[in-house]
């Protein structure tokens, strides 16, 4: 699957120094920190340890284009509102972790509030600095601070924190959405799946044409995008069914209309 690397260019010099130390240490025979076990769709009270950095503008949503390796767009706007982050390998899971939600909290430095925030995974990072690493948007990173002390927290550059996976709860009125991606045509359909309540992430997507009984399985393309290549014309309308990591299935009847066009239908029902 196609992957993009999350940039941390706006983190403090402390983070840059830490990364240089990792690379220098590796050259001297010191192993990089290996990733932890994959985080799955299990929920509870247990908190795990992680490190966090930030990237992009200090109060921004991370990527310059407000997108990321999951394929989402406008993550600076509702319902994400910039509360986003890049997960390392056991969190991003080669795109299977896109859309999953996590509570994060920090207790040091003193500017940390100690209160949990909730972030959505929208991007990927490969920095080998901890078994679990969240590279957050500047806005999300600062949100872990006491009111008025956001710059003090961002100034730390890198934080030790605790995290746990939680179920995603989107604002009332937010519905799962299927965006027909650019490049789609009658023989190729690519769907971006987003705003999934509960587990947040999707592990399977199928479509069924109106009047037919057979479900057609889509393949993973990259991030949260699923695709099908077929010699048969895809005319629609199509019912879409997704399966989340925890096994929840949901169907959306005729959500892709007849005569659909690429990059024109951001459809939800």
Swiss-Prot record:
SUPFAM superfamilies: Barwin-like endoglucanases (SSF50685), PHL pollen allergen (SSF49590). Keywords: Allergen, Glycoprotein, Secreted, Signal. It comes from Phalaris aquatica. Glycans are attached at residue 38. This is Major pollen allergen Pha a 1. It is found in: Secreted. Residues 67-173 form the Expansin-like EG45 domain. Residues 187-268 form the Expansin-like CBD domain. InterPro entries: Expan_Lol_pI, Expansin/allergen_DPBB_dom, Expansin_CBD, Expansin_CBD_sf, LolPI, RlpA-like_DPBB, RlpA-like_sf. One of its GO terms (biological process) is plant-type cell wall loosening. The keyword Transmembrane helix does not apply. Disulfide bonds: none annotated. Residues 1-29 form the signal peptide. Belongs to the expansin family. Expansin B subfamily. One of its GO terms (cellular component) is extracellular region. The keyword Signal applies.
């Amino acid at each position: 699957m196609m992957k993009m690397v999350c940039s941390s260019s706006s983190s403090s010099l402390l983070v840059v120094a830490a990364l240089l130390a990792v690379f220098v240490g590796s050259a001297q025979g010191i192993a990089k920190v290996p990733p932890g076990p994959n985080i799955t769709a299990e929920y509870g009270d247990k908190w795990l340890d992680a490190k966090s950095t930030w990237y992009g503008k200090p109060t921004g949503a991370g990527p310059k284009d407000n997108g990321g390796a999951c394929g989402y767009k406008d993550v600076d706007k509702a319902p994400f509102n910039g509360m986003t982050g890049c997960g390392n390998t056991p969190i991003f899971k080669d795109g299977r972790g896109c859309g999953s939600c996590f509570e994060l909290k920090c207790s040091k430095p003193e500017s940390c509030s100690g209160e949990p925030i909730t972030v959505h995974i929208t991007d990927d990072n490969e920095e080998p600095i901890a078994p679990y690493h969240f590279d957050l948007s500047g806005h999300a990173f600062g949100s872990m601070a006491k009111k008025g002390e956001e710059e003090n927290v961002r100034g730390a550059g890198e934080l030790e924190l605790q995290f746990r996976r939680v179920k995603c709860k989107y604002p009332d009125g937010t519905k799962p959405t299927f965006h027909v991606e650019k490049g789609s045509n009658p023989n190729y359909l690519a769907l971006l799946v987003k705003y999934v309540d509960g587990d947040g992430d999707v592990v399977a997507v199928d479509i069924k044409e109106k009047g037919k009984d057979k479900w057609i399985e889509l393949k993973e393309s990259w991030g949260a995008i699923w695709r099908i290549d077929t010699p048969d014309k895809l005319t629609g309308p199509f019912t879409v069914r997704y399966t989340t990591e925890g096994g929840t299935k949901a169907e959306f009847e005729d959500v892709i209309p007849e005569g659909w066009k690429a990059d024109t239908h951001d459809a939800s029902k």
